[in-house]
Amino acid sequence: MQFSTPSSARTINRLRVLNLLAREGEFSRADIARRLTLNKPSTSEIVEQLLQEGLVEEKGKAKTANGRRPTTLALQQGSRLVLGVELGSKNTCFTLSDLLGNVLRFERIPTPIKPDAQEHGLTIIKTCLKMRRITKTPIAGITVATSAQISNDSLSILRHDHWPWENVPLAKAISEYTQTPAILVHSMRAMVEAEQWFAGEDQKSFLYVNWGEHISGALVQDNTIVGEKSRFGHLPVRQTGLCRCGGIGCLETVAAGWALSERFAGTSVKDLAQSQDPKVVQALQEAAEAMGIALTSASAITGCNKIILGGGVSNLPDHYISLLQQYYQQHTHHSLANIPVVRSQLKDRSTVLGSVAVALDRWVFQRRMLQTMQGL
């Protein structure tokens, strides 16, 4: 995009107005012009366009101390919807949301242990069609979050580490059958987006760890994800223990949901967390300590300003998380000992809300592009 051309400038300013109303609520035309340093004719033109698109509505007269009362404008949050899909190892979740990310409809279907790409793909398409039929409001786009390797055009799964999926054009098929734009996004990117959109995360440098059935991590630097394809869950923390990857002593062998569940005859981590069995308690303490070891190494390498833990296993009772935090503080370099190590406020909703955030950004608000422009 040539930012210097008039049409591009109008496009950018339209997005700035839309994001202002989405983030901060009602404004008059004059307030928008002042806040974004736009001239009044340009502001009026942009507002008129947004009104015609149905993205913005006039709310009424603002309260003023004196003089003419201006008309306020607000985001028409129900004018468009997005559909976020989490293709998880145990469940596939679908969330239909408005422009503010409010959940209007949620559905969950079990993910088979080793799903057939064609069968499960068809189930996903049918559920997307069902979600599309229950509303008359336009769905701007569909985003599917997955831990798989994704093609450059974000339409196909190239390879999945845990399933026999190769070159599966999932998003392309969803788009063709639903007549709605669709893309794939890596789960780590979705979770980071969720923190920034829905948890108010404003740190420019932080490490995000997805501690769930499997373990992964991503470093965010200057609002950009680096190391999205890192293998955080396979950091060595022990000298024994065969991992599913074929390695020995990986973090996953001690702390991943699959490893903890296998150790106790398939019992879910949620149930294990409530157990008082000494063997279970010891296993969960070892998992917390192993995560502390991995975070100590990651912190020393990255120098991040914050560590955020997401995913299902991160919802262990507080005393296990406190044990992890204590281990980190005691063993990390003194200059890094005081950085926050916290659980995500979004708990186990991070991935599916992240798919919603990516959809909102891609098809409505384009905040990533605006952030990139600010850094030029």
Segments predicted by a language model, with ranges:
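Phosphate-binding/catalytic loop of phosphoryl-transfer enzymes
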Residues: V85, P138-G246, C250-W258, G354, ...
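ATP-binding/phosphotransfer module of carbohydrate and carboxylate kinases, centering on a glycine-rich
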Residues: M1-K61, A65-P138, T178, F198-G200, ...
